[in-house]
């Protein structure tokens, strides 16, 4: 259910784009992101950092898209999120006591420090590649293709990466690792 909630602004953007175009879809995505952050805050009494991060980027780039009537700003949004995520994941390996992926997953799985750092690097590289791929699609194909890629390609590649990661993790865990759950 949380996954659907997290993708709420993207799905609305996709649907509205199909009927009304890029500018209306951008405005709706901005409102949807703001609504998402407010709803989450009311329901859970705190903010989800990723929602705030995404909201800030969509407000800046979406606002620029609407103000300048130029869709290139919104097309850069996924790349901005991917590359800033890559920077945060990479930096977490050097700042703090643990890589970010370990902080996110260690309650559910027990891995060696070496594997945590490899996994963190894998996510860093994944985000860099996804950001570059978004730009490639944005600059080499029309907006219809980019919008489809933004939803289906982004989600599809992320699910594929998580599946590959799961197979990798099975080689480096034992059944006791999952007893924490």
Swiss-Prot record:
Q: Which InterPro entries match?
A: YciB
Per the record's keyword annotation, is rRNA processing included, yes or no? no
TM annotation in the entry: 3-23, 54-74, 81-101, 119-139, 149-169
Principal localization reads membrane
Question: What membrane topology does this protein have?
Answer: Multi-pass membrane protein
Query: Does this entry carry the keyword Oxidoreductase?
Result: no
One GO term describing the cellular component: plasma membrane
Q: Which Pfam families match?
A: IspA
Record localization: Cell inner membrane
Ordered alphabetically, the record's keywords are:
Cell inner membrane, Cell membrane, Membrane, Transmembrane, Transmembrane helix
Q: Which family does it belong to?
A: Belongs to the YciB family.
Question: What the protein does?
Answer: Plays a role in cell envelope biogenesis, maintenance of cell envelope integrity and membrane homeostasis.
Protein name, per record: Inner membrane-spanning protein YciB
Taxonomic classification: Bacteria, Pseudomonadati, Pseudomonadota, Gammaproteobacteria, Legionellales
| Protein's gene | yciB
């Amino acid at each position: 259910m949380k996954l659907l909630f997290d993708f709420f602004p993207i799905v609305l953007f996709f649907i509205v784009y199909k009927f009304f175009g890029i500018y209306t879809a951008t405005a709706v995505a901005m409102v949807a992101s703001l609504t998402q952050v407010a709803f989450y805050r009311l329901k859970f009494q705190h903010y989800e950092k990723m929602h705030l991060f995404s909201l800030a980027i969509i407000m800046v780039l979406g606002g620029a898209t609407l103000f300048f009537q130029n869709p290139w700003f919104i097309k850069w949004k996924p790349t901005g999120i991917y590359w800033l995520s890559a920077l945060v994941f990479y930096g977490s390996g050097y700042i703090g006591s643990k890589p970010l992926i370990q902080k996110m997953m260690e309650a559910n799985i027990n891995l060696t420090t070496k594997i945590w750092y490899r996994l963190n690097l894998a996510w860093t590289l994944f985000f860099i590649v996804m950001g570059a791929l978004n730009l490639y699609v944005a600059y080499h194909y029309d907006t219809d293709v980019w919008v489809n890629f933004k939803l289906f390609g982004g989600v599809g590649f992320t699910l594929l990466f998580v599946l590959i990661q799961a197979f990798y993790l099975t080689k480096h865990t034992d059944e006791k690792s999952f007893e924490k759950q």
